[in-house]
Amino acid sequence: MLLLTLALLSAPSDSAVSAVVRDIQVAPGEVLRTTSRGTGEPLVLIPGIFGAAYGYRRITGPLVALGFRTIVIEPLGYGFSSHPKKADYSFTAQTVRISNALDQLGVKQALFVAQSSGAAIAFRLAILRPDLVRGLLSIDGGPAESAATPGMKKAFKFGGMITKFAVDESKLRHDVRKEIVRNSGDTTWVTDAVVRGYTAGQTADMSGSIDAFQRMSKSKETDSLASRLHQLEVPVRLMVGTVSHPSEVTSDQRELLSEKLPDFKTESVQGSGQYIQEEQPTAVVAAVTELDKASR
């Protein structure tokens, strides 16, 4: 732990680590934004809907310093990836796209870190393409069965056109900030600059983003993730914040993972909410280090 702490203290900031941004076409009109740093062993990070690569800025530098090549992949409709109006935004379709992007990047047997809804994609990827995944760390993200959450469905109850009239950049930032605060333990990290960073991909294409969100609200999965979790054989670690928050991983989801996965552990992070990589980044880096050892 002392060596890890020293590494973190001496790690370059995210902005100081040279980034390679590559937009990868995975299908006609479907482009995924990838951001890579470092040259070591591959570590793939999948964000939630908001945040993009920016949401991992506090851990990518330290992880590169520890010898990893970090690769943030933003799923379709997330962050700066494209927001096609008629695409399939189911988690299953997103999983296929992520695997396509990784194939084009030449990545195999990577560690994965996924936050929030990104974890639902990562779970499926580890089942669909075990050759790509050697270990998975979920940051407060459970085995969600659908991208069409009750909140999404409610937001688009009256259709996307009305939403476009009601939501501008300022309104989006306000709503995202409110949700981040509700789902955080220590909220001091939630500044105006951070909220702008978390929403930059969406505000760059407001109309397209709203179209994508509406499609997510109507997405359907072809089969159940719960019925296939037993096929996931790599080590899986779940980090959860101890501060109660609306988007937390439910007790039923935790029990399901514990029952179905052969190598599963949960770590509770005191004082944190959903955004552990923001509130306690050193805990996430330490968890990645332990996962790296367990997956060899």
Task: Please provide the spans of the model-predicted regions.
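Active-site loop/oxyanion-hole signature of alpha/beta-hydrolase fold enzymes
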Residues: V17, A27-E30, T35, P75-S117, ...
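Short glycine-enriched nucleophile-adjacent loop
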Residues: A119-P130, L136
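Conserved alpha/beta-hydrolase catalytic His-Asp/Glu region
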Residues: A148-K153, V167-H230
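Conserved loop-alpha-helix segment in the C-terminal half of the alpha/beta-hydrolase fold
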Residues: V236-S272
